[in-house]
Amino acid sequence: LSLEPLQRTLIGRRLLQVSRESLRRIFFLSYAWRLTHKKKFLARCEDELLTVSKFNDWNPSHFLDVAEMTMAVSIGYDWLFNDLQAKSREVISKAIIEKGLTPSQDSKYNGWLRGSNNWNQVCNAGITFGALAVYESQPAASLALIERAIKSIAIPMKEYAPDGNYKEGYSYWGYGTSFNVLFNNVLEKIFGTDFNLNSQPGFMQTASFYENLIGPSGQPFSYSDCGGIEGLQPAMFWFADKLKDPSLLFIEKKYLQTSKFNVKSNRLLPAAMLWANGISVKDIKEPAQKIWNGNGGNEVTMMRTSWWGGKEIYVGYKGGSPSVSHGHMDAGSFV
């Protein structure tokens, strides 16, 4: 509430840090408003929405910036819709259409539609949130974008086959898979179906891949581009709920117990609250599986003697190729 309004300030060619902070602020504030109905959250969230809606653009030359900003504004617009001033709704919806949806149809900016990495997942999720937010006023155009996204996002989802291995490694699993989960989840909420996306080979197994990457030290097996421990991962709660497998949250439970979640950087944190509904902490037990093997284009194997206790032995080994997205010359590396 005390932070200065965001400005359209690029770092190099990117507005991404502003888009991500906008998503964090708007997601947190709109969630707080719906939870508490305290006017201070509504007023500040409306200000945030209007501020970014009045930017001259959302930097389509680096489309991740547009995707995250579109998702941010769409969440706020939808969750606050009945409480926003009429003039604000007009400004915000116009921004979603002109600065989010329209540039996604320009071939100069939408090469991600054919990509097989996190860009496809993030951009399709952001644009779909935007299309759903303005669906009532733009039904035909919105439906076309949603149908396009369903076809397009199937491309990177094929990369999870056959076992759930994510080629880009630990850190980018947290990015690409989280936005893929947001995409699948919103389709189910609105249309009552996931359009068979959840049944893509390997996708529902990928939560086990991510959980097994964490060793007894609490650090991940850090191959490919990896910034180290990410902390609480909201998408894991979605998988645990879908699969009715609380053991997928064993590491997340440890993060909660040790406060390893950062409200200043985890812009998707409110989603954990939504997806954790109905999951009891007492039901979260140690996973039975101690060996995980993932085939695909960046093969990896992890094994351990136990999950916690202080005397565990953990081994991680990878094969694969350095040519995958965010890959390194690390075939044969191990921990």
Regions found by a protein language model. Name each.
Residues 172-335:
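Extended polysaccharide-engagement surfaces of secreted carbohydrate-active enzymes
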